[in-house]
């Protein structure tokens, strides 16, 4: 019989969302870090800016998440030295997949969503499972509140399926401002039902002009 002592992971909660538009990408996550019914900190960023116009948001076990982010940052720095340019967002998406798959027999307990701009300046979102399987979509949510948020995003966005032929761009029809407002609304709703999501919302908006961050307050109970 399995015992709790055999389980080496801890889920520290939190929720991550990314939305891709025609010329922008929004990556957002709450800042609560918790274990069970205990809040460890109310100001923990789950978003890491890695490559050129690219941000990774992760939920799960923070020990593994920190190790994963550090690994990817080191690989991206090595790429810069070797190629004299920053890694693109699709290239980072493939690197993340390879890194997760490499650890598949003792996986990083991290559930990731990567967002940014591709080589054509279009928004792109890549969503993952724990062992590196991924796909490019118009939007995604990961973490403890994802089951509450994804139905709302499905209803509001209806991004084209990557399985449709002929292929269509997996971007959402909303403007940048509308996408940010939608992210605020879904997080405000999720915090009413998910005790592991809350405190503050960190929003990273990526477009051709660069990257900007915004913070808003969420429920703190």
From Swiss-Prot:
UniProt GO cellular component terms: cytosol; nucleus; proteasome core complex, beta-subunit complex
Protein name: Proteasome subunit beta type-1
Compartment list: Cytoplasm; Nucleus
Free-text function comment from the UniProt entry: Non-catalytic component of the proteasome, a multicatalytic proteinase complex which is characterized by its ability to cleave peptides with Arg, Phe, Tyr, Leu, and Glu adjacent to the leaving group at neutral or slightly basic pH. The proteasome has an ATP-dependent proteolytic activity.
Pfam families for this protein: Proteasome (PF00227)
Self-association state and partner proteins as the record states: The 26S proteasome consists of a 20S proteasome core and two 19S regulatory subunits. The 20S proteasome core is composed of 28 subunits that are arranged in four stacked rings, resulting in a barrel-shaped structure. The two end rings are each formed by seven alpha subunits, and the two central rings are each formed by seven beta subunits. The catalytic chamber with the active sites is on the inside of the barrel.
Record has Transmembrane helix as a keyword: no
Gene3D superfamilies registered for this protein in UniProt: Glutamine Phosphoribosylpyrophosphate, subunit 1, domain 1
GO biological process: proteasome-mediated ubiquitin-dependent protein catabolic process
Species name: Oryza sativa subsp. japonica
Keywords from the named record: Cytoplasm, Nucleus, Proteasome
Gene that produces this protein: PBF1
The family this protein is said to belong to: Belongs to the peptidase T1B family.
PANTHER family, sorted: METALLOPROTEASE TLDD, PROTEASOME SUBUNIT BETA TYPE-1
């Amino acid at each position: 019989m399995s015992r709790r002592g055999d389980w080496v992971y801890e889920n520290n909660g939190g929720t991550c969302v990314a939305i891709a538009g025609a010329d922008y990408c929004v990556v957002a996550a709450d800042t609560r870090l918790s274990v069970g019914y205990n809040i460890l900190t109310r100001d923990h960023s789950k978003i890491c800016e890695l490559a050129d116009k690219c941000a990774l948001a992760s939920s799960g076990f923070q020990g593994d998440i920190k190790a994963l982010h550090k690994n990817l940052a080191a690989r991206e720095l090595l790429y810069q030295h070797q190629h004299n340019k920053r890694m693109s967002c699709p290239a980072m998406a493939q690197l993340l997949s390879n890194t997760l798959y490499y650890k598949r027999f003792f996986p990083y307990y991290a559930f990731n969503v990567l967002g940014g701009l591709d080589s054509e300046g279009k928004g792109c979102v890549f969503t993952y499972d724990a062992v590196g399987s991924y796909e490019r979509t118009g939007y995604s949510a990961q973490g403890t509140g994802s089951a509450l948020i994804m139905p709302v995003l499905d209803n509001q966005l209806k991004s084209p399926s990557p399985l449709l032929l002929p292929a269509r761009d997996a971007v959402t029809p909303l403007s940048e401002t509308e996408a940010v407002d939608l992210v605020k609304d879904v997080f405000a709703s999720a915090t009413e039902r998910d005790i592991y999501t809350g405190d503050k919302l960190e929003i990273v908006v990526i477009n051709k002009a660069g990257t900007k961050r915004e913070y808003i307050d969420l429920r703190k109970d």
